[in-house]
Amino acid sequence: MAFEEMIKKALDESRNNCRLGDTLEEVQEIQNYIKNAEKIYIPNKNGIKVDVLNKVLREYNLPSAKILQINTNEADSNRSPAFAKAIMALDVCDADLIIARGRLGLPGSGSLLLFVDNKGRILTCGTSPSHAISQKTLEDAVYELSLIHI
């Protein structure tokens, strides 16, 4: 099943009150979308997250992501800063895939790593607790979170 057809089918099921949850086929379509992405961007103002995410992308034989050097501080005033970063990136580049990481919500709420398609739809994501609790370095937190979702 093609990616867009899979989305339409799931929406039709929801509309018709017969959706029973995600299927393995849907998960595989999302994985295929990620694996077939050619233009991958990471909105960030420094390269630390980009270096770590590119290490993971290489481990899965995926193309390297490019840093999209935009000031994402404004995203922190949003209710969902990580998603706001992804949308900011889509507004300024022609990407197949955006990988954005930022605060989950309120200060202290933890971090959210998002994989977003070229239409701003969340493909997958992962959360991690605040660094104040986990005591993990930025590099370790990003690496561990991204491994799970590719």
Show the residue positions of the predicted features.
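Helix-enriched interaction subdomains in cytosolic or periplasmic regions
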Residues: 1-20
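A short, basic/flexible loop-to-alpha-helix module at the beginning of a structural domain
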Residues: 20-35
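N-terminal beta1-alpha1 ligand-phosphate binding loop
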Residues: 36-56
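Short helix-loop-beta junction
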Residues: 55-65
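Short, solvent-exposed, polar/charged sequence segments at loop or secondary-structure edges
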Residues: 71-94
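A short, hydrophobic beta-strand-centered structural micro-motif
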Residues: 90-106
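Amphipathic beta-strand/beta-sheet edge segments enriched in Tyr/Trp
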Residues: 105-131
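Conserved small/polar residues in nucleotide/adenosyl-binding loops
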Residues: 148-150
